[in-house]
């Protein structure tokens, strides 16, 4: 009976450890909360960075940030992988002007739930600001070249 309990609990540990790993990210991409992420230290304009992310496959976009935990993960990813130490890093948040109002939308189509915006300027694109260790979002000119972070849901 003792061996059965020991074997059963051992199998349970193996099962539980594997159950959280139901997806894999490609080489050089990092997993977090059911998505794959990669920081690119190749400065591009916002629209070009978004196009590049979409070409990475599987519905890729510039990063959308939905929680403080994800913001912390992305900030660490930038620190670990973008060595040029730029003032800003592109993210997938844009102001969308529609007639008399302006709304913010992620390039992946998701709604803006978590916000950490510094309201200093009124540009159309957003970047993560170096001054705040890439945790605050700032309006910046879409035509400037900056490194960027891509995100996509993995293939299961």
Swiss-Prot record:
It holds the Pfam family Lectin_C. It comes from the Eukaryota. Expressed by the venom gland. SMART domains: CLECT (SM00034). InterPro entries: C-type_lectin-like, C-type_lectin-like/link_sf, C-type_lectin/snaclec_domain, CTDL_fold. The keyword Metal-binding does not apply. Residues 1-21 form the signal peptide. PANTHER family: MANNOSE, PHOSPHOLIPASE, LECTIN RECEPTOR RELATED (PTHR22803). Belongs to the snaclec family. This is Snaclec 2. It comes from Bitis gabonica (Gaboon adder).
């Amino acid at each position: 009976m003792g061996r059965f309990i020991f074997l059963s609990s051992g199998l349970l540990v193996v099962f539980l450890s594997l159950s959280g790993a139901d997806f894999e990210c490609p080489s050089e991409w990092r997993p977090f909360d059911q998505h794959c992420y990669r920081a690119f230290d190749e400065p591009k304009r916002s629209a070009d960075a978004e196009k590049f992310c979409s070409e990475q496959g599987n519905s890729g976009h510039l990063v959308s940030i939905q929680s403080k935990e994800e913001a912390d993960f992305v900030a660490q990813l930038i620190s670990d992988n973008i060595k040029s130490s730029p003032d800003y890093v592109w993210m997938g948040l844009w102001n969308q002007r529609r007639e008399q109002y302006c709304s913010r939308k992620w390039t992946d189509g998701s709604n803006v739930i978590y916000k950490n915006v510094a309201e200093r300027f009124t540009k159309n694109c957003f970047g993560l600001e170096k001054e705040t260790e890439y945790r605050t979002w700032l309006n910046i000119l879409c035509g400037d070249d900056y490194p960027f972070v891509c995100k996509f849901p993995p293939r299961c």
